[in-house]
Amino acid sequence: MRRDISIERLNFSKQMQFIKLVICCWLVTPSASAISWRECANQEKVWYKTPEAKRIGDNVLYFQSDLGGWYKNDGSIHPSGNAAIDIRSKEGQRRHKKSLQQLKYPCTLDNDATWSEMRFLAKVYAATGQQKYKYGFLKGIRYLLEAQYPNGGWPQFYPLRPGYSSRITFNDSAMIGAITIVDDVAQRRSYYNLADEKLRKKCQTAVTKGRECILKCQIIVRGKKTAWCQQHDQQTFEPAQGRISENPSLSGAESVGVVKYLMTIDKPSPKIIDAISSAAKWLHQVKITGVRIYNFKDDSLPGGADRKIIADPSASPIWARYYEIGTNRPMFIEKGKVKYKLSELSHAKRIGHLWIGGRWPESLLKVEYPAWIEKHQAKD
C-alpha cells in the first residue's frame, strides 16, 4: 500500500532537499525548453548551468559560421533556443552544417544576430566554465572587429552583401548591438571580461572609431543636430535608402537605441553630450499628441481587421517610425513613394508595419535622459 508523504512531516534539511529537487526538475522540463530565443537571454543565473542551457549553447556553436558570426535567428536556417539540431542523426547534422557553409552571406547583425548569440555563450561559459563557449564568444568578437568599416561603422551583413545591406546600419539595433558588446569586452564588464589584453585593446580602438562614426552620422538640419536614419552611406555618412519602403529619413525608433548607448559612456566628451542632448530635444519635439491608433474589425478585408488614426485628447504621446528630413512630417511609404496619411497606404501596408503609434522614446525622455542629466550635472 502506498503511503502519502507530506512535506510538512519532513525535517527542515529534508524539506530543503525536496525543494531543490523540485526546482531542478522544473528547470529541465519541456516547458522550460520551450522558451523563445529572446527569453534565453534573460533567465536567472542558475538556469545557464542546466542541461537545457548547455544544449542550446551547443546549438549556438553548431550554427556559428567559420567566420565567427551567425545568420539571423529565423527559426529555420538558424533555429532558436528550443530548436533541436541535436536530435538529428550525425549524418543529418553533417549535411546541414555543409549547407550552412555554402551560404554566400552567412553572417549578419540583422534581427539581433551574432551579438545575441555571443551574449548567450558568455553567460553559459560563466555558469559552466566550459571553454568551448568562451572560444565561441571570442571568435564572435574577432568577427565583429573584422566586419567593422575603417570609418567605424558596421554593415548589416559581412562579408558584404550588395545593396542596402552594405550600409552603416542602425536598423533593428545592428550597429548598436555590435558596438555595445565590443564595448563590454573593452571595459571588462561582467560576463564579457574574456579577452586577453591584446584583443581588449583592439576592442577599445573599435569602440572609439564606432563612436566617431555615430557622431558623423547624426543628421544636421539647418545647422541643428537631430537624430539618425536607419541606414547611412558607408562613405559619406549621409542618410541612405534601405529596403524599398525604408526611405532616407529620421528614425523615431532606432535613434532611441543610439542615444541610450551614448548615455552609457562614463566620461562623455562635449561632442557626445551635445549629440545626446540634441537628439533628446528632437525626439521631444516630434512627439505626436491628441491622437491614438485604433485597430478595429472589418470582415470585408483580408484578415478581418484594419487600422486608423483617431482623435483622442487624453492619449499618451506617440511617435512615427519615419520622419521626413527637414519637415519632421511622419512618413508612410509604399514601394518607395511617400504618403503623409496612414489611410493612403494599401490595406496590407497599413496593417503590416508599425508606421506610427510606437512609444520608443517614452522611457528615455521621462526617466533615463533626466537621470543622465542629473548624473552629469552632479559630476560637473
Residue ranges and their predicted role:
Residues K134, L138-I141, L145, P162-Q218, ...:
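Eukaryote-skewed repeat-based solenoidal scaffolds used as protein-protein interaction platforms
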Residues A34, A41-K49, S99-A113, P162-M175, ...:
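Solvent-exposed loop and edge beta-strand segments that line ligand/cofactor-binding
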